[in-house]
Regions:
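A generic structural signal for alpha->beta connector loops
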Residues: 13-16, 29, 127, 160-162
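Active-site HxH/HxHxD metal-binding segment of metal-dependent hydrolases
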Residues: 1-24
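Cap/insert and terminal regions of metallo-dependent hydrolase folds
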Residues: 67-165
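Alpha-helix N-cap/helix-start and coil->helix boundary motif
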Residues: 2, 86, 170-171
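Core dinuclear metal-dependent hydrolase active-site scaffold
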Residues: 20-78, 174-176
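Beta-strand->loop->alpha-helix junctions that form or flank phosphate-binding loops
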Residues: 16-20, 158-169
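Cofactor-binding loop segments of dinucleotide-utilizing enzymes, especially the Rossmann-like FAD-
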Residues: 61, 135, 168
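Short active-site-adjacent helix-start/loop capping segments
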Residues: 3-6, 140, 173-174
Length: 176
């Protein structure tokens, strides 16, 4: 991530660059855990934040779902997850074949179907809200991402669960 944004934020001294993997961090009773996600960039991590019995889980740049990701998203009150592309839009869209294969590959991104299936696998009574993010402008629409997840929730009798699409403007503050 730093390599991508360093031109915008300037140089950060090496002593201030700390990539902490597989370590729990506690800040004012908030427990922050990280977990590796499969992506073609270096050191991509997902995070869980736990405070006073509440849990928020965040995962983006997820090439494929594995048990580590599932275990970390389980028992969440809120999940923030990428829903990057619609398979049909990707395959018929403007990207060249190499990039299409990269996006849908094991080190690429989650499709709407894959993100929705993952949410279906980690559903629990605690889960109140799902934020869908990192939605491709070329290969997806917010409506397709939303509808894909809504179909899974409806099938599981969880259609009351809140779904929100995150765009560049961000979101309102959500209290768990």
């Amino acid at each position: 991530t730093y390599n991508v944004i360093k031109d915008r934020i300037g140089k950060i001294g090496k002593k201030n660059l700390n990539f902490i993997r597989d370590e729990k961090i506690v800040i004012d009773n908030c427990v922050i855990n990280n977990f590796e996600v499969m992506h073609d960039a270096e050191k991509c991590l997902g995070y869980t934040f736990e405070y006073e019995g509440k849990k928020l889980s965040y995962a983006s740049d997820v090439g494929c779902v594995n048990n580590i990701i599932k275990e970390n998203l389980k028992n969440s009150d809120v999940i923030v997850l990428e829903s990057n592309y619609d398979y049909n839009m990707l395959m018929t869209g403007p990207y060249h074949w190499e990039l299409k294969n990269r996006v849908k590959g094991r080190n690429g991104h989650l499709s709407n179907a894959e993100a929705s299936k993952l949410i279906g696998q980690v559903l629990c009574e605690k889960l109140k809200k799902v934020y869908l993010m990192h939605i491709s402008k070329d290969n997806n629409t917010p409506e397709l991402a939303y509808n894909s997840l809504y179909q899974i929730l409806e099938r599981e009798n969880k259609s009351h669960l809140e779904i929100e699409i995150i765009n560049e403007e961000g979101t309102e503050i959500y209290k768990i």
